[in-house]
Amino acid sequence: MDASTKTKKGAGGRKGGGPRKKSVTRSIRAGLQFPVGRIGRYLKKGRYAQRVGTGAPVYLAAVLEYLAAEVLELAGNAARDNKKNRIIPRHVLLAVRNDEELGKLLAGVTIAHGGVLPNINPVLLPKKTERSNTVSKEPKSPKPKAGKSPKKA
């Protein structure tokens, strides 16, 4: 037997075969953008449980992707309301705090450089009177025009 006639099996038996088949990631299979494999690795490495099922990282990736999309959509709306093209932490804070469900979910979270929600205590606002509601028919007296002051010599 000649050693050169044997096929080497170091590459999984495909050494002389055709082109390699394109790999399909679990993220692509699930139709997700978030990395299913990386999340699965983190679940295993974090020792949250002895074993991690095959569906757990897919489900978690889908949930995280949904939450990220929701926050980014609301933050994009906040940026557009402020006539800006770029989302900054302030827009993220406004989006999260103005949304009831996200505000409840992220109640204990501090967003760096987010600031605070604008809020004025109603007691400090000027009181509405009856005169402001009804239009007064009396014209206001015009202000006297200020003439030129005489030049000082």
From Swiss-Prot:
Residues 1-24, 127-153 are annotated as: Disordered. It is found in: Nucleus; Chromosome. A motif (SPKK motif) lies at residues 149-152. It comes from the Eukaryota. GO terms for cellular component: nucleosome; nucleus. Contains one SPKK motif which may interact with the minor groove of A/T-rich DNA sites. Phosphorylation of this motif may regulate DNA binding. This motif is reiterated in both termini of histone H1 and in the N-terminus of sea urchin histones H2B, but its presence in the C-terminus seems to be unique to plant H2A. This is Probable histone H2A.2. It comes from Medicago truncatula.
